């Protein structure tokens, strides 16, 4: 339907390795061209984030991720909530087209942004979005992605740990942004 009703020309549907989590109602919302899915902390860990409403917290983190890294980011978000750090997840539904204006308006509301993707850091969507943020005066961010090197065989968890993409590594990156 998207390809037939919009004037974007050819496009590719990238199927993630994992399915969308059915427990998060946001993943069932209608698709808006160029926009991802915002999962507020209060929806992810409602019992822990209620007292951490954004207006009452000192700092807020936004995780921007592709579908393949959602589970690691979700664990990091829950872990941060246990330490009284409010963090939301923005799951990218689109790489292109991307509603840049919407993304910048969203990103500007946060004290730090952690971009997490299962692609190569150089030339990936995280690099693109971090440059977009910098051009718009948003500078407290970090990019978590694979460096350009060979990784040994291993389980997904082992490879993510080697690439510093484990939930614990993602959490540490978020905490380091709050210290800036």
Language-model-derived ranges and their functions:
Residues 3-180:
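Thiamine diphosphate
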